[in-house]
């Protein structure tokens, strides 16, 4: 398990870089008294969490946007306007 301080530093680094160079991974591991493997695996897991977290809001936004556009009258002018542009 990681200490709060280690997680804080790892999160801070992740905020700036989702991928580490080997040199940076060695520096972080040394600074936080972790092995390179621990840092590498933490970043792999964190990237997966990040991808999951960022997929959900996008799909929700898409479904709500498409739902609102097709549900009401505002959808009609939107469907007509693309026909006006090509001609």
Curated annotation (Swiss-Prot):
GO terms for cellular component: nucleoplasm. Residues 77-87 have a biased composition (Polar residues). Residues 63-73 have a biased composition (Low complexity). Keywords: Developmental protein, DNA-binding, Homeobox, Nucleus, Transcription, Transcription regulation. It is found in: Nucleus. Gene3D superfamilies: Homeodomain-like (1.10.10.60). The keyword Metal-binding does not apply. CDD domains: homeodomain. SMART domains: HOX. Residues 1-54 bind DNA. The keyword Transcription applies. GO terms for molecular function: DNA-binding transcription factor activity, RNA polymerase II-specific; RNA polymerase II cis-regulatory region sequence-specific DNA binding. One of its GO terms (biological process) is positive regulation of transcription by RNA polymerase II. Residues 52-87 are annotated as: Disordered. PANTHER family: HOMEOBOX PROTEIN HOX-A4 (PTHR45771:SF2), HOMEOTIC PROTEIN DEFORMED (PTHR45771). Sequence-specific transcription factor which is part of a developmental regulatory system that provides cells with specific positional identities on the anterior-posterior axis. Belongs to the Antp homeobox family. Deformed subfamily. This is Homeobox protein Hox-A4. The gene is HOXA4.
